[in-house]
Regions:
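Acidic-leaning, charged glycine-interspersed low-complexity segments
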Residues: 19, 36, 84-137
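Small/polar-rich, solvent-exposed N-terminal microdomains that initiate assembly or binding
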Residues: 1-51, 81, 89-93, 134-137
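Short, polar/acidic, helix-capping and beta-turn segments at strand->helix junctions
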Residues: 33-36, 49-50, 54-59, 112-116
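Short, cysteine-centered beta-strand-loop-beta hairpins and adjacent loop/turn segments enriched
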Residues: 48-51, 69-72, 127-134
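Oligomerization/assembly interface segments of phage tail-like spikes and tubes
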Residues: 55-69, 116-127
Length: 137
């Protein structure tokens, strides 16, 4: 489910009408060659969140915005747009559904060379759509 969610999240962010105008790249990993600003999945981890009759996963995904500039308000506006887009992600995914999406934390920092980075972490809880666990081979 984690791989499915990561791919769906990147596709959802890329499909936003405004984000591609703000960012030069939205990539699952660090893009091989992209000028700032760009967005990547920095890390993800999953744990069991199964129910009595369905498999489930709790998946934490940290995405990182990389930008350049002296004005933190500009990077902050991009981070808010990203957070809003993630919160609006539709629940249906191939083979599972998102039960909920919770913002966990964000961290912003100024880096050398007028670079800025914002790490945004969300928790996704997913439930498998397929047949109940007791009916599985």
């Amino acid at each position: 489910m984690e791989t499915t969610l990561r791919a769906a999240l990147i596709a959802w962010l890329r499909a936003d009408p405004a984000l591609p105008d703000m960012l030069n790249d939205i990539h699952e990993e660090a893009p091989p060659a992209a000028s700032l600003p760009w967005l990547q999945i920095a890390a993800s981890a999953s744990a069991d969140w199964s129910m009595k009759d369905r498999r489930g996963r709790e998946i934490r995904i940290a995405i990182e915005l990389h930008a350049r500039g002296d004005d933190p308000a500009e990077t902050g506006a991009m981070a808010r747009a990203i957070e809003q887009r993630i919160a609006a992600m539709p629940p249906a995914l191939p083979g599972c559904r998102i039960a909920n999406i919770i913002f966990l934390r964000a961290r912003a920092e100024q880096r050398a060379g007028h670079r800025r980075a914002v790490l945004i972490e969300h928790r996704f809880r997913l439930i498998e759509d397929r047949q109940p666990m007791e009916n599985r081979p």
